[in-house]
Structures are given as structure tokens and as C-alpha cells.
Amino acid sequence: MAIKKVLVVDDSTADLVNLQEIIADAGYLVMTAASGHEAIKKAQAESPDIIFMDIVMDSMDGYQACRELNQNTKTKDIPVVFVTSKNQKADRMWAEMQGGKALVSKPYTADQILEQISRFQ
């Protein structure tokens, strides 16, 4: 599948802008969301090819948003890559159990983010 549209989800404006710049500079169309609820709405409306999502967010965390995306027939095939400061082995296992396809630890490099896009091309 060719990745063209990317949804970035983070409640930290600094992290959201940083990810957006990395991905947009590589030539991809980037949409953003600041919460799990907003991510679900945008994913349903815009059908991104991949989602980069923070885990620790207010009201709905990334795990819950990922579970809901995976239960929806319209969004269940969109790969979710968690981008988070939670980087223990248990965090990686839990992320996978919630339906995440990968986990990138903060702080990250542009290459680590773009490598994840390449994995799903």
C-alpha cells in the first residue's frame, strides 16, 4: 500500500508540530489531532494510510483510541504506530496487545519516524 496520508495524534503541541514537520518535509500529507476522540473522528472521515499516536493523553489515551479504531470496520486496517515516552518491554507488549503495529520511543529521530512509514509502504 502506498502511504500518502498520515494522521499524527498528540496532546503536546510541541510533539505534534515536530512530527508534522518531519512527515510533511518527507512529502506526505499530514493531518493532526490533539486527542484520542479527535483521532477517531479524523480517521473515520479522512481514512489516513497510517497513524502515529501518543499513548498518554487526557480523556482518551492512545491505547483506548487504538482499540476503538481496530473495532471499526472503516478504520481497522489502518496501522497505528505509538510514539511515546513509555518504552519498557511491558509497554511494547501492551501496545501490541491493543492493536498497535509498532512503538517509537521519545525522544526519536526523523529517521525512526520515516522508517515506520517505509515499513508499511
Residue positions per predicted region:
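The feature encodes the CheY-like receiver
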Residues: L16, D58-S59, K76, Q88
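Charged docking surfaces used in two-component/phosphorelay signaling
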Residues: V17-D25
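Short hydrophobic/Thr-rich beta-strand motif most characteristic of the beta2 strand and flanking loop
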Residues: G27-A34, K42
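A Lys-centered signature of the CheY-like receiver
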Residues: D54, K106
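C-terminal output helix
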Residues: Y108-I117
